[in-house]
């Protein structure tokens, strides 16, 4: 039982680290100039924690079957307490992930609008135009 408690604590700690990374990602996405290297590093760290959490979940499932207990662990106070904290962290992570996704989509949209405007400008720049007096203008 102690091993299951430790695994659930590890899952909670990894989720808290993931939450910290999501806040860093959010702060970086809000900046007008995004540091791509920082974002890439954050993504790599998020992938690391997600793999670690997936591995811990497999161990947790094995121990739950072995002890024949399952979430929300109502009959075990310590497990239930940690499980409730995990659930609340997951809700916060979901909200932050949605915020990050919205900001990222807005940045892509603005970037695409800029590229489209720039292409139109370049196309118009190559066109030959004539002034009021009929002479070529550049």
Curated annotation (Swiss-Prot):
It comes from the Bacteria. GO terms for biological process: bacterial-type flagellum assembly. It is found in: Cytoplasm. Keywords: Bacterial flagellum biogenesis, Cytoplasm. InterPro entries: FlgN-like, FlgN-like_sf. GO terms for cellular component: cytoplasm. The keyword Cytoplasm applies. Its main location: cytoplasm. Belongs to the FlgN family. Required for the efficient initiation of filament assembly. This is Putative flagella synthesis protein FlgN. The lineage of its organism: Bacteria, Pseudomonadati, Pseudomonadota, Gammaproteobacteria, Enterobacterales.
């Amino acid at each position: 039982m102690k091993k299951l408690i430790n695994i659930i604590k590890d899952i909670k700690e990894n989720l808290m680290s993931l939450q910290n990374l999501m806040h860093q990602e959010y702060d970086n996405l809000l900046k007008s100039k995004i540091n791509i290297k920082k974002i890439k590093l954050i993504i790599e760290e998020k992938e690391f924690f997600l793999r670690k959490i997936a591995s811990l979940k497999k161990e947790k499932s094995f121990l739950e079957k072995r002890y024949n207990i399952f979430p929300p662990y109502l009959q075990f106070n310590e497990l239930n307490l940690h499980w409730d904290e995990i659930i609340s962290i997951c809700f916060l992570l979901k909200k932050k992930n949605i915020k990050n996704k919205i900001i990222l989509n807005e940045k892509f949209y603005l970037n695409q609008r800029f590229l489209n405007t720039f292409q139109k400008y370049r196309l118009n720049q190559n066109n030959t135009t004539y002034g009021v007096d009929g002479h070529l203008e550049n």
